[in-house]
From Swiss-Prot:
Cofactor(s) named in the record: Ca(2+)
PANTHER family documented for this protein: PECTATE LYASE 16-RELATED, PECTATE LYASE 18-RELATED
Organism (species): Arabidopsis thaliana
Residues of the active site: 272
Name by which UniProt lists this protein: Probable pectate lyase 16
């Protein structure tokens, strides 16, 4: 067999893998464009989060083991691990008086719950979904979409896991009454139309979700939220993708620590992957496919460590730079560093700052970051997985 024949076979296999994965995970008629770059290693290597649980055929009987697999700043997140299972049996929603069997009824409870789904469903929420502390929303084993209405709000709570669901076409919430616990219904002034908005919360993990086409952002982490890990997600077809930090004047965001790892920032994304203010962002082993404006940006002196990412620049000559500082000057001392990153199609990263940028991870938070050339394999299954209850998740 000639070298040319082997190369052709590799191209065909990679294309098939990408298209099948997109279809299996319900990318709603949109097939992600496969970049014209072959992965630089085989397709059988998993990242540290996935290797912790995905190959176990008994995952459905031991769902809560997932909580042991989070890495990075959100590694202490328990979700509903210490609670009972709650099964969503129907997609119907009532913002003020949710009924048993609905998603909203589960997420507002005061006790820990691990929430699963009895069947495939599309949930269109009446108003924003207020998630209480110690909850896991676990979509494995079903195709679950939250779409075409307001979406998820995580506000002033702790220990929330959102895993394996698709969140897209989110709309602004309405002014009105929304229940946030069994004993409290409060006035809401209307949400912005984010897929997931995280306010003043800690120990949050967003993993293996599909996020696209919302009115405002896909993920916002603001108001001094910290202890956040955003991993294994597939982002596509959106403008302002991920905001970390409320505004330049909100000094409390200096405590914010966020890990962004093993995500696939796919086609049709414009900017903010992420955009950071004041806090610390570890951006590691992510794949970026042809952003339109920039990939990683920020203002107000954030610390950004870009490690082992795989950047494929747009074909446009004015969109090659990975980074963007949202000020005209004074950013030379901001600590923005790159290590082990791979740059394709003319992509480049402009570093800045002096002194150490060592990761402030505890031993429990620390994980191995691979060289950037391995990222196409490590992110190949970003987004919701195809999980059969009687076998491993693919």
């Amino acid at each position: 067999m000639t070298l040319f024949t082997v190369s052709c076979l590799l191209v065909v296999l990679f294309l098939c893998h990408s298209l099948v994965h997109a279809e299996n995970n319900g990318y709603y008629g949109y097939t992600p464009t496969v970049a014209n770059y072959l992965p630089e290693k085989p397709q059988n290597i998993m990242n540290p989060v996935d290797s912790c649980w995905r190959l176990k055929s008994d995952w459905a009987a031991n769902r809560k083991d997932l909580a042991d697999c989070v890495v990075g700043f959100g590694s202490s997140t328990l979700g509903g691990k210490k609670g009972n299972l709650y099964v969503v049996t129907n997609p119907y929603d009532n913002a003020q008086n949710p009924q048993p069997g609905s998603l909203r009824y589960g997420v507002i409870q005061a006790k820990p719950l691990w929430i699963t789904f009895a069947k495939d469903m599309v949930i269109t929420l009446e108003n924003e979904l207020m998630v209480n502390s110690y909850k896991t929303i676990d979509g494995r084993g079903a195709k679950v979409e939250i779409a075409y209405g307001p979406c998820i709000t995580i506000q002033d709570v702790t220990n929330v896991i959102v895993h394996g669901i698709s969140i897209h076409d989110c709309k602004p919430g309405k002014y009105g009454m929304v229940r946030s616990s069994p004993t409290h219904v409060g006035h809401r002034k209307g949400s912005d139309g984010d897929a997931i908005a995280i306010f003043g919360s800690s120990n949050i993990w967003i993993d293996h979700c599909y996020l696209a086409s919302c009115t405002d952002g896909l993920i916002d982490v603001i108001h001094a939220s910290t202890g956040i890990t955003i991993s294994n997600n597939y982002f596509t077809q959106h403008d302002k993708v991920m905001l970390l930090g409320h505004n330049d004047d909100f000094v409390q965001d200096v405590k914010m620590k966020v890990t962004v790892a093993f995500n696939h920032f796919g086609p049709g994304l414009v900017e903010r992957m992420p955009r950071v203010r004041r806090g610390y962002a570890h951006v590691a082993n992510n794949r970026y496919d042809k952003w339109i404006m920039y990939a990683i940006g920020g203002s107000a002196d954030p610390t950004i460590f870009s490690e082992g990412n795989y950047f494929i620049a747009s074909d446009k000559s004015n969109s090659k730079e990975v980074t963007k500082r949202e000020v005209k000057g004074g950013w030379n001392n901001w600590r923005w560093r790159t290590s082990k990153d791979v740059f394709k199609n003319g992509a480049y990263f402009v570093p800045s700052g002096y002194g150490s940028i060592s990761l402030p991870y505890s031993s429990a938070q620390r994980f191995t970051v691979a060289p950037g050339n391995l990222v196409p394999s490590l992110t190949a299954d970003a987004g919701p997985l195809n999980c059969n209850r009687n076998g491993p998740c693919y």
